[in-house]
Amino acid sequence: MDVSKCLAEGDPQGVTSRGQHRTAHTDRFPVVHTYPMPPVLFWLLLYSCCLCQGHCHPYDRLREQNTEFAVKLYQKIVTTENRTDVVISPSSVARSLGLLQFGAQGSTFTQIEKTLGYNVFDKSVKIFMKSMHRELTNSSQDTSICLACALFVQAGTPISTQFTEYTVQWANSSLQLTNFTEHNRTAIQINQWVNRNTGGGTETMVAGGQFGSGFMQIALVSTMYFKSKWKTKFSFTDTQTLPFISTDGSVVKVPMMHQTADVAYGQFETPSHEKFTVVELPYLGNTVSMFVVRPTDRNTPLSSIESNLTSKSITTWANTMKKIKMDIFLPRFKLESYSDLRMALSALGISDLFDPRKADFKGISEQKNLYVSQAIHKAQIEVEEGGTRASGVTAMVLLKRSRMPVFKADRPFFFFLRQASSGSVLFIGRVTNPLH
């Protein structure tokens, strides 16, 4: 029996593990009505859970914790860095923190565990992460995914053999030795590593002046690059130059892609009754989809929708949206973001690892004063008609009017790429001006 598909995942008829039938919902808290469960069904469900041998609930919890971390990290980065256009890969950051957790002890370990919601030494966590990474990086000719993390550690630091073994086993991670006293050489080493792990698209990520001296240091670096083809391609000949209303109210002309397809679509509202729409656009293979979220009212700020985002709301959207044939308009855009995670992670409760007096990494080395001096994250995403770089020719086509429903992302929106099987948010970002 596949323990990752146990009872707690639910069934297509909408019956929950407690015999509940969902009859209504909001975007955050589904409303359920409870009916008596037939005795035979109760025992069958109980037997199924026993077969799972405790894996059902841990796996569901891990899915939710992964999503919750993604949401909170995104919200912190958007607010602490005051970003307009941004993209991050929460999955990449989480794996980097997981690698650090192997070597952390004391309150440093506790802070990472509390923020991630799990302990990497737990066997179920290791199995879940390994399975998720294997599926995620199973690239084909239509999909390219590069996920990697590295710890750059001061040369001469005696590294624990056990930690080195953890590094080799943990999600395309590596341990790199460097000399932080040679600032420029360290920057070149990190930049070269990043360039190799972002499809060759990043030449400069750090500068030599970012590194201090006086303590033994660790630089935590994580990257993720994603490029794939749509399940239903946008027709390049249908791409038009259309107006997009940016955050400040100004209008810019952007290349707006178009497709007519059967997509999952839903209309929701926040607890304060601000309405928004969500559309799901799958990539080839149906393992990853892009969810595009846009306020319904032009006067509703995107931040009011983002601030109410939770892991439960994302699960609700994915489970309750309905298939409908409609016209989709989505701007062509490419985002590339660099993030210094120190402020965002500290705001999430992970602060000791950045303090040379409090950081405890005795699991990495018995060397004192070992701390994280840099936490660097790079993410890139490119959204185009067919998933490959478009040529320089722009076709101007006036689309015929249609009576079908229309979803037009002609105002600021946020998006996230979600892996269907694990529910993990691979990327999350916002677009306020597609031309940036």
Task: Please give the residue ranges for each predicted region.
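Non-catalytic, conformational "gating/processing" segments within enzyme and secreted inhibitor domains
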Residues: 83, 122-304, 316-402
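Intrinsically disordered, low-complexity basic segments at termini and long loops, enriched
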Residues: 1-36, 396, 403, 432-433
